[in-house]
Amino acid sequence: MIRRAPGGGAPLRAAGTLLFLAAWEAIGRSGLWGESFPALSTIGGVFVNDASRNLLLRALGRTAESASYGLTLGAIAALLLACASSLWPRLRTGLDALATGIYAIPTITFGPVFILVAGPEATPIVLSALSAYFPIFVALDSGLRFAPAAQRDLAVVLGASRARAFGRVDFPAALPAFVDGLRLAAPGAVLGAVLGEWFGAPRGLGVVIISSLQNVRIPQLWAAALLCVTCSLLAYVLLSALHRQAHRRYAW
């Protein structure tokens, strides 16, 4: 059997990325898809202008803040309800239905409701939390269900209560799944924050996207969109590193 060396695919991934960026630049410069698809160099020129750069960076900070709060709130809600589902199995059907219902309804449809209830400042955080809740709940609930039964039964036989066995066996075993849920939820949290900013928030990348679209500032629109992608990827990469640490530390 031939085994690939660790990281052996990195040069291929880098080459693919460079090829994609070169193709984007060539298509943008050729005008093949019109002015709505600018070259990367044109988009990068937006950051040369001090006013545009400061606007985008302030908006990025606001969106990242909303997404961070939303991811945290979604994670707390998912953590509490998944643990409740594991400790009290009678609640499982209802909590599973709640998670499915939140996932089935498009997040953007909640926007007008939360504008009235929570206000424009809080709506990006709430939509971000809703977007993050489902993947974290499903991942953690699955991890708790497949926790090692033998170790749990041994703890109970040795006199541990159900709650104590949960804290000593089930939850530590499910931690890698919980972090995996965080990793999968992070891009959705950013998207939820951006969608929430479309409903009247005063600041954020979503506001810049709408403003750029209305004023036909195509390069600035693309710059804001690429910052959203960068923010999502950065969160995913950081949480992937945390997931590897959790897997090495707690995986059975």
What are these regions (language model features)?
Residues I2-A5, R29-L73:
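Periplasmic/extracellular loop-to-transmembrane helix junction in inner-membrane transport proteins
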Residues Y69-A99, P112:
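Transmembrane-helix boundary motif in ABC transporter permease subunits
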Residues P89, R145, P176, D180, ...:
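C-terminal transmembrane helix and the adjacent membrane-cytosol boundary/short C-terminal tail
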Residues A139-L184, L205, I209:
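Short cytoplasmic-facing helical segments at TM-TM junctions of multi-pass membrane proteins
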Residues M1-L18, V237-W252:
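Transmembrane alpha-helical segments of polytopic membrane transport and secretion proteins
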Residues L116, L191-C228, H247-W252:
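Glycine-rich helix-loop "coupling/hinge" segments at transmembrane-helix boundaries
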Residues V126-L130, A163-G196, W222-A223, A235, ...:
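Transmembrane alpha-helices
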Residues T100-P135, S142-F146:
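Generic hydrophobic transmembrane alpha-helix motif, especially the helices
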